[in-house]
Amino acid sequence: AEGVLPADGPDRMIEEYREHLDKGELLYNPVLAGYKHPKTIDWTPFLTKGYIENCDTTVPIKELKRLSKRLTTFPEGFVLHSRVKKIAEDRAAMGEGKVPVDWGMAENLAYASLLVSGYGVRISGEDVGRGTFFHRHAAFHDQDRENWAEGTYHPLMNLQEKQSSFYSYDSVLSEEAVLAFEYGYASANPYELVIWEAQFGDFANGAQVVIDQFIASGEAKW
């Protein structure tokens, strides 16, 4: 009715298709079996050990204290929110051994130990910079900043002159898209810890297809 194809168009297409079949001609572009793209990541070295095998992840106390100092040091003139300032002060005391280390500080120290050892860290999710329950604080905001786009400081990006990259992305409420992207990113970066964090437990439901189709069966299926 719209004139997209002439009246005899479909019949002619079928006839031509059958003529090609009768001649034994290939009607599709062949896919090369066993082809390996030059930029394909070789995961073979990482498949020799089981994930339940013991691994020494200890960090010397001297190094933990050094990293703690870096995690609680801010640029001159950087003004913290009063509640966040208290958290930073408590973390400094934790690094000095004056009070027990809490979950948020332990997490930041773990990331820091990876970053100075040559392993990148990348976190994404709706509220990962602060942490949904106010625990992480990987990103700090200057209360005297002139505009929203400026005045953000990430201690994990400033541990030492030579370190691996740290990124934290407060992503939009599109769990499936974000997790799918991060899965692809992680697949191409074996030396980087890539984390997607659902803001609340049921938010993972929006990304369930990616979990089922790619992550749960990743090694066996893909």
PLM ranges: what are they?
Residues 1-222:
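Flexible, glycine-rich loop/tail regions that form catalytic "lids" or insertion modules at the edges
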